[in-house]
């Protein structure tokens, strides 16, 4: 609800008509009813409870694409936009003739530090907005603006992925087609960072629970990981990371010791 409130507070955007699509993947906490009451114009796409983030986004985008919009904007429901963020992102896209993907950086409301966006291709660190468009790598799907021109080249998110991985895959597909990933000039809003250490690689949990978590759609499903790595890096690297991910799950404390 808060996410939608922030979106609608800056609509309409000058020169554009906007439609919002939201996937209801079997929600039982009353969100659908609340949205329908407060924002009846939102187009709700129904799921079966097994879509998770990526497949939910894929289904909503598929529905939206049937209308044929000039731009498509992904926004996570835990991302709260600053005033003018959408209009400024559209201007950034037009600045590069709508041939790049515009990614918005988010920051923690508590600390002001960067939480999601694009990374420096050399260092792997999150890029910090500096008032100019910056080319980066490894997009996060919190705020992503895709023009019709780019969509016609890349299409939708890959529904092979349940939850995570789809945004990473989309960014890599773009780079392989020489479509630039550009960080918007300023922070577009706030989003708090998720738990740093996932359950599947957290030594505080027993192996059985870690293994179950690893193979859940919200974990690091091995088949999806292999699919992603094989597509973009080839079989040798895919096989290597398949094995090391299993070892990471089985011996997480060793990984932590090596990292430090």
Model-predicted segments: where are they?
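A recurrent flexible, glycine/aromatic-enriched loop bordering the glycosyltransferase active site
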Residues: 125-146, 213
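A conserved acidic beta->alpha catalytic loop
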Residues: 6, 24-33
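Conserved donor NDP-sugar-binding/catalytic core segment of glycosyltransferases
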Residues: 80-116
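Non-catalytic, C-terminal membrane-associated alpha-helical segments of glycosyltransferases
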Residues: 99, 196-260
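A short, conserved alpha-helix in the catalytic core of glycosyltransferases
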Residues: 144-146, 150-155, 160-187
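Short, well-formed alpha-helical segments that are part of the catalytic scaffolds
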Residues: 1-11
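Short beta-strand-to-loop acidic/aromatic patch adjacent to the donor-nucleotide binding site
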Residues: 69-80
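Glycine-rich, basic loop-to-helix element that forms the pyrophosphate-binding segment
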Residues: 47-67
């Amino acid at each position: 609800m808060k996410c939608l409130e922030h979106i609608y507070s800056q609509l309409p955007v000058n020169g554009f008509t906007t439609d919002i699509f939201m996937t209801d993947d079997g929600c039982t906490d009353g969100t659908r009813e609340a949205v329908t009451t407060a924002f009846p114009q939102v187009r709700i796409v129904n799921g079966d409870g097994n879509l998770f983030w990526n497949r939910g986004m894929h289904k909503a985008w598929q529905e939206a694409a049937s209308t044929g919009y000039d731009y498509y904007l992904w926004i996570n429901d835990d991302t709260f936009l600053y005033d003018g963020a959408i209009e400024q992102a559209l201007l950034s896209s037009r600045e590069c003739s709508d041939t790049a993907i515009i990614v918005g950086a988010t920051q923690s409301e508590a600390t002001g530090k960067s939480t999601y966006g694009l990374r420096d291709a050399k260092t792997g660190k999150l890029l910090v907005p500096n008032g100019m468009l910056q080319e980066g790598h490894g997009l996060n799907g919190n705020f992503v603006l895709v023009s019709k021109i780019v969509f016609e080249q890349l299409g939708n998110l890959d529904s092979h992925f349940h939850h995570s991985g789809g945004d990473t895959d989309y960014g890599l597909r773009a780079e392989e087609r020489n479509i630039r990933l550009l960080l918007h000039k300023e922070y577009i809003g706030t989003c708090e960072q998720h738990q740093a250490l996932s359950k599947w690689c957290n030594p505080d949990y027993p192996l059985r629970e870690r293994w179950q978590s690893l193979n859940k759609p919200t974990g690091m499903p091995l088949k999806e990981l292999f699919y992603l790595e094989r597509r973009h890096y080839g079989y040798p690297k895919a096989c290597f990371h398949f094995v090391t991910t299993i070892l990471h799950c089985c011996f997480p404390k060793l990984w932590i010791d090596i990292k430090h």
